[in-house]
Amino acid sequence: IRERVVDILSNLPANDTFDWVDEVSVELTARMLATLFDFPYEDRRKLIHWSDITTDTPELTGAEILDPEQRKADLMDCAGTFMGLWQDRVARPPKFDLISMMAHGKDTQNMTENPMLFLGNILLLIVGGNDTTRNSISGGVLALNEFPAQHRLLMDRPELIPNMVSEMIRWQTPVIHMRRRALADQRLGDELIRAGEKVVMWYLSGNRDESVFPEADRLMIDRPNARSHVAFGFGIHRCMGNRLAEMQLRVLWEEIHKRYEHIEVVGAAERNPNNFIRGIKSLPVRLHHRR
């Protein structure tokens, strides 16, 4: 992770304005996803595209209108590509990439017998590995510009970076909500949730709960209970890649702290018009290097 972070940061424009989302957030995420899947490195941006068209579903999320036929064709391209990778892994000894582990795993080796189940699981892994990390990286830069006192605190106390990572994830909350179906009757407070009913969990609302997080709309990098956020879900549905996401963010901010006095946001952030993914499409910045 550090090797990839250093390479990305070392090749950023020194004195020009550039888009932080494309040059850093997306690029780091694409490189890490390609590594996890042992996906052809030169095609890594396809992973980001497939993730974007999976979550940009206008009828469900309010996102921008996409050409439905093109979207379908692109998702079939995704399915075909990963089917090819799967068949390649089946023919080889087990390795440590996710495709190989699933292809040789007792509980997952027959997944391709149901093509839609296979595609659904692949897209779940791609989206899960893309959106949380990518938008927390972008949101963190934006937050430190909105709350300059917190940026000064970071400069003075870099040991706060691990806690800051949790606070940035809480503040950004990249996945806004998730829906589950109750398997049994369950009483929650004064409400009875019956088996078969659908329950929507608003992670963004939970992470702004003033009874848990005082001044919840503020970024506070020394917040004592920052790790109590629910951005990764909870219980058996907690994101299995949460430690990797935190590690990527921690390493990135450690390397940023070594190099830059400030990452200045110099224009308006373009947000993703979506009620499922709380994303940032572009963020113009200029770097101020340490002297």
Where are these regions (language model features)?
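Cytochrome P450
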Residues: 1-291
